[in-house]
Amino acid sequence: MTVANHARPIRRALLSVSDKTGILEFAKALHAQGVELLSTGGTARLLADNGVPVIEVSDYTGHPEIMDGRVKTLHPKVHGGILARRGLDENVMAANNINAIDLVAVNLYPFADTVAKAGCTLEDAIENIDIGGPTMVRAAAKNHKDVTIVVNAADYNRVLAEMAVNNGSTTHATRFDLAIAAFEHTAGYDGMIANYFGTMVPMHRVPAHSTDECFQDSLSVEGSKFPRTFNTQLVKKQDLRYGENSHQAAAFYVDTKIDEASVATAVQLQGKALSYNNIADTDAALECVKEFSEPACVIVKHANPCGVALGKDLLDAYNRAYQTDPTSAFGGIIAFNGELDAATASAIVERQFVEVIIAPVVSQGARDVVAKKTNVRLLECGQWNTKTQTLDYKRVNGGLLVQDRDQGMVGLDDIKVVTKRQPTESELKDLMFCWKVAKFVKSNAIVYAKDGMTIGVGAGQMSRVYSAKIAGIKAADEGLEVVNSVMASDAFFPFRDGIDAAAAAGISCIIQPGGSMRDAEIIAAADEHGMAMVMTGMRHFRH
């Protein structure tokens, strides 16, 4: 029999879990198949209290748990039984009174849950660092040729089902797969611990060998939000046909610790497989539309919003968003912040070619409509309530830039009017709409908007004035009236030329962060043109 299908019978199992979900049922099923059960502490008490025959590990080894339970399973009879190579180590086992342990079911102390609690002390964290658990897990995973390791309650039934059809045995293929999961489990666990303690290392902003006087204070006695070594664990959701370009291999990994509605949580209801670019663009569209509470639609092309609008309903919002730039909307990604209905879905598929449509909920009527266009990727991401504070990553050659996700957003109470003219109520409403859109446009970003609808988007230009000019050109190309519309800039204006270009186009009001050394000149230019201007004090660069 080859290793590929070599079955190993399970006659003795060691069960020791912190998360006791399903463990009682698992133990009963193992006992019913004649498996001898070893266990520790709370797990052993749970089994015994429910009438499941179990041997305490301390009784099995002849050595009591010591040091308040810090040492329970670190014993040759335990680890020898797990690590013993069947057909090779029997003489050693017999000489040392060691019995083979064929299955290990272990999950670890809840370190992440503990340190996430308000008021968690260093001592609390230390006492929730599991020692014996990871040791047993790694031992069983190492010896997966002979031992079955289970670290996830979701795999209990899988093991039982395989035992049922293999005369109480598991196959090598299953043991190998479970061993990989075990190593992933311990790697993630140790990574969490390293990250937690790594934030206690003094902050370090520049290389220690730097002699530049301006960096003499680069070391701080305070800890850092970011650990000395950065450990994260992502799970592969799917392999992709290729990456950003066809010569690049790619895959999509997700952070399973985050449950906020996103492209990562989305379920694909129909359509071709998502591509690398589809996923990136869908993320940009969805995160933008999540900024709005009113019915909203965002159309994205190459990671930039090309049309964003509010409406009395989603159909109205889509029609208005499409109107901004029908040319760029071709082959775009469309995101909504409400339930996609049949009427809106019909308008989309009858009007344009679309790569992806995503919404928190998709009605059955909308599904039936889109089903007629089999290539359209239709995604349902679920409702979002709050946003999770996560990290953003940017790969550079030889390293990784890590920062907080940009969740900043100002309200009417946060902005400051800096010009002689005050914005009108309708202008203020459009300013806030426009500012939310600008946050998701590649820098340098300029957005023109009017009545809750973008009328021109200038994205990704090296000079801000050219982004302003492009926004005006876009509006003119679509026959959209710029006069008395508002403008948002993701960062400050370094010169007055951007203000002059906006005035020439007919812009009446501007929202921008401020902070330029020429702010006074910029404000004077706005006053000269009779424009209103507000400053947010918050920048939204996007690269």
UniProtKB/Swiss-Prot annotation:
This protein's domain notes: The IMP cyclohydrolase activity resides in the N-terminal region.
Family to which the UniProt record says this protein belongs: Belongs to the PurH family.
InterPro entries linked: AICAR_Tfase_dup_dom_sf, Cytidine_deaminase-like, MGS-like_dom, MGS-like_dom_sf, PurH-like
EC number: 2.1.2.3, 3.5.4.10
Source organism: Shewanella oneidensis (strain ATCC 700550 / JCM 31522 / CIP 106686 / LMG 19005 / NCIMB 14063 / MR-1)
Keywords annotated in UniProt: Hydrolase, Multifunctional enzyme, Purine biosynthesis, Transferase
PROSITE patterns noted in UniProt: MGS (PS51855)
Annotated pathway: Purine metabolism; IMP biosynthesis via de novo pathway; 5-formamido-1-(5-phospho-D-ribosyl)imidazole-4-carboxamide from 5-amino-1-(5-phospho-D-ribosyl)imidazole-4-carboxamide (10-formyl THF route): step 1/1; Purine metabolism; IMP biosynthesis via de novo pathway; IMP from 5-formamido-1-(5-phospho-D-ribosyl)imidazole-4-carboxamide: step 1/1
Descriptive protein name: Bifunctional purine biosynthesis protein PurH
BP-aspect Gene Ontology terms: 'de novo' IMP biosynthetic process
MGS-like domain span: 5-151
Gene: purH
HAMAP family with a match to the protein in the record: PurH
Reactions this protein catalyses: (6R)-10-formyltetrahydrofolate + 5-amino-1-(5-phospho-beta-D-ribosyl)imidazole-4-carboxamide = 5-formamido-1-(5-phospho-D-ribosyl)imidazole-4-carboxamide + (6S)-5,6,7,8-tetrahydrofolate; IMP + H2O = 5-formamido-1-(5-phospho-D-ribosyl)imidazole-4-carboxamide
